[in-house]
């Protein structure tokens, strides 16, 4: 008997996921279908649903349970609205629906893909759903095969939801009434990202730039005794602004001159705070398995620092740790709620959960764009050709199998090139990606050699750890 649940996330990074008989069998970001980066909309991504179901050979009528997530809303108020949207689009479909809290969906996405029997779960993002008029900012759960239970939570002011406005990241524009509003760690990182001239969802640029700078502030992170620590809107912003005032420079000149140092400053603060929180959680709850989720944990420098500081823990981060992983958590929670059964070990089912394409469809696409190609029946022969091209410093567009979940290109939809040529990074950034020269790339090695090259504390299959290189 087929017991199938559908997970849906609306907002930014819309996504769809499918659980069948306790196993995740499909997950797809809407941006892969609508070709709109981060696919932002309150609308249900029906085309993405249909594409994934067609690929999996599942009818909408086979689905019994639906889980829905959003962000920065009282999610339970949306149940009737989205039930009506689904039942109006898919006629004569009988299903049960549950709206899942944003941070709980993050927790489910990472714990149920970890393979752990029991774990601490730490969620940190820009903001989750509303809690008494405020937004979730950091949450801690204890998870086992029976349930995921919230044990601690911190909230932030809902007034700072849109940080792109000048009154939230440039001190003279800040309303005095806002200065002491609480803000999440991830939101603080986003705030500094705007301060140094980047845009929404470009915190990864700040992380990349941070490696070129030096910390401007000697942080004295307080001892963490619970999750109710102070982090206000003006913190770091005010100190950097005072440095600008004493610099004798114009504000744009100051920011441009010191932007890598400002980036490094927020990176160091984030690392120190999160490491202190993790230490507090390990000490209090005496659990050495830790699952992480939320957009903050796309920061691979931070993630490696956690393992470097606490080498005895077992760490899992879902490859779709941002909001594109929400649908996975929603599907798991819907299945768990309505089926009321223990979910199976899904750690081996990730990250390749999207759609694959037949050779004929690929040929048709190449011919539609008048692109030349050679077709190889032999995989061995194809691999030799690829290896030869890489050796000759040619750049490979690698497209194979089912697409990855999450924002990282994990060799199913990847650009691959020779890392031994010193000019390759700059060449790809300039000629292929058309982006800033400081943007990094990830090295790829066979798993058996990963600790030969890198100071890894555990394996890194999802491009979510940034270890140092062994000499």
Language-model segments: residues:
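N-terminal phosphate-binding loop and adjacent alpha-helix
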Residues: 32-58, 274
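Flexible beta->alpha loop and helix N-cap segments adjacent to enzyme active/binding sites
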Residues: 9-38, 83-99, 104-107, 111-235, ...
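Phosphate/pyrophosphate-binding loops at sites that engage ATP/ADP/AMP, CoA/4′-phosphopantetheine
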Residues: 48-64, 277-287
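Short beta-strand-loop/turn "lid" adjacent to the catalytic site in phosphate-handling enzymes
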Residues: 54-89, 95, 108-109
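Extreme N-terminal starter segment of soluble prokaryotic enzymes
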Residues: 1-6
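Short glycine-rich phosphate-binding loop at a beta-alpha junction
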Residues: 60-73, 286-295, 396-397
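Active-site cores of enzymes that catalyze phosphoryl transfer or operate on phosphate-rich substrates
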Residues: 208-268
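Phosphate/ATP-binding catalytic cores across multiple sugar-kinase/actin-like superfamilies
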Residues: 264-290
């Amino acid at each position: 008997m087929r017991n199938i649940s559908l997970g849906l996330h609306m907002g930014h990074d819309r996504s769809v996921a499918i659980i069948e008989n306790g196993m995740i069998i499909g997950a797809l970001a809407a941006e892969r279908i609508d070709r709109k980066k981060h696919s932002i909309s309150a609308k249900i991504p029906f085309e993405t649903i249909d594409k994934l179901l067609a690929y999996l050979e599942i009818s909408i009528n086979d689905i019994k349970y639906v889980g829905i997530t959003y962000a920065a809303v009282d999610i339970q108020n949306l149940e009737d609205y989205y039930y009506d949207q689904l039942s109006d689009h898919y006629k004569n479909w009988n299903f049960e629906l549950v709206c899942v809290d944003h941070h709980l969906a993050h927790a489910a996405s990472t714990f149920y893909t970890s393979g752990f029997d029991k774990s601490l779960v730490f969620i940190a993002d820009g903001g989750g759903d509303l809690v008494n008029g405020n937004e979730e900012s950091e949450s801690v759960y204890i998870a086992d095969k029976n349930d995921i239970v919230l044990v601690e939570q911190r909230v932030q002011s809902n007034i700072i939801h849109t940080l792109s406005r000048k009154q939230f990241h440039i001190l003279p524009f800040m309303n005095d009434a806002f200065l002491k509003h609480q803000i999440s760690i991830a939101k603080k990182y986003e705030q500094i990202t705007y301060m140094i001239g980047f845009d929404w969802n470009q915190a990864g640029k700040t992380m990349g730039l941070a490696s070129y700078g030096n910390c401007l502030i000697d942080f004295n992170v307080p001892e963490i005794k619970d999750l109710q620590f102070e982090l206000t809107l003006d913190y770091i912003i005010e100190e950097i602004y005072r440095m600008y005032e004493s610099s004798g420079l114009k504000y744009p000149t100051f920011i441009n001159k010191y932007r890598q140092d400002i980036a490094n400053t927020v990176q160091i603060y984030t690392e120190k705070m999160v490491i202190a929180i993790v230490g507090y959680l390990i000490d209090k709850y005496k659990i050495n398995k830790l699952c992480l989720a939320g957009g903050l944990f796309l920061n691979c420098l931070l993630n490696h620092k956690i393992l470097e500081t606490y080498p005895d823990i077992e760490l899992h981060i879902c490859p779709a740790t941002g909001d594109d992983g929400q649908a996975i958590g929603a599907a798991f929670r819907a299945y768990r709620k309505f089926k009321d059964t223990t979910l199976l070990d899904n750690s081996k089912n990730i990250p390749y959960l999207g759609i694959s394409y037949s050779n004929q469809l690929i040929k048709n696409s190449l011919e539609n764009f008048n692109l030349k190609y050679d077709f190889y029946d032999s995989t061995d022969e194809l691999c030799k050709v690829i290896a030869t091209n890489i050796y000759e410093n040619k750049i490979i567009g690698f497209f194979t199998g089912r697409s990855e979940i999450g924002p990282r290109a994990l060799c199913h939809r990847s650009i691959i090139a020779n890392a031994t040529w010193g000019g390759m990074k700059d060449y790809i950034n300039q000629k292929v990606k058309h982006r800033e020269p400081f943007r990094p790339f990830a090295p790829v090695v066979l798993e058996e050699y990963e600790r030969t090259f890198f100071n890894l504390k555990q394996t890194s299959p999802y491009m979510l750890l940034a270890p140092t290189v062994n000499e």
